[in-house]
A protein has these predicted regions:
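Extended accessory and catalytic-adjacent subdomains in large enzymes
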Residues: 2-204
């Protein structure tokens, strides 16, 4: 347990440092989604998917975990592309259903176009990012920021949701300890929902 705590602490410490690097990371991913090299396009599109939805990487799991669908193991049947949106629907970790719709506007339009290209001529049971694994994703992330991995990135995305919630509810600093705890739980719930973890609404 102690080793896991140390690993988690290191992950959180790295995630905290990402706040100042996030624009650099996003800009590089967006640029590479238009690269002429198809492998770079595939890797950066998988990385954008994780950035955009906080989805797990897919083929990276603890020994006691069952195989689950994630970014690199996503199949054509898990994604529905309309003219203006991307709809995800699949069972993720702990058999929790992951449903999310991303509108194809701004950078998400390039994301939509890349996915459209990737699913072309594929069967429903085919993986969208064929040939791309967590190793490729993590190598790509760490080429932008040293030590950055998909797990660290998801930790950053979750912690930024918590920080945003607490900033928006700044008045709770004057609240009693029970109210503070309740809001802390709500903030964590929002982060858990973004990461598609199983969580229940805290009791008051």
């Amino acid at each position: 347990a102690g080793i896991k705590q140390e690993r988690d602490q290191a992950k959180y410490d790295k995630a905290k440092k990402l706040a100042s690097e996030i624009n650099k990371i996003k800009d590089r991913i967006v640029k590479d989604m238009q690269d002429k090299n198809s492998k770079i396009r595939r890797i950066s599109t998988a990385c954008y998917l994780i950035y955009r939805t906080a989805m797990r990487v897919g083929d990276e799991k603890d020994p006691e975990e069952a195989d689950t669908v994630g970014a690199t193991t996503l199949r054509k049947e898990h994604v529905n592309l309309t003219g203006s949106s991307i709809e995800f629907d699949f069972l993720g970790k702990d058999s929790v259903r992951w449903q999310e719709t991303v509108q194809a506007v701004g950078h998400d339009k390039q994301f939509h176009d890349n996915l459209k290209e990737l699913v072309l001529k594929k069967k429903n049971s085919d993986e969208i990012f064929d040939g791309i694994t967590s190793r490729h994703v993590n190598q790509y992330y760490s080429s932008i920021v040293e030590g950055l991995t998909a797990k660290v990135f998801r930790t950053y995305l979750a912690s930024s949701v918590v920080s945003k919630y607490l900033r928006e509810h700044d008045s709770i600093k004057k609240s009693n300890p029970a109210e503070k705890l309740y809001h802390a739980k709500l903030a964590n719930l929002e982060a858990a929902m973004m990461c598609n973890h199983k969580r229940t609404i805290p009791k008051t």
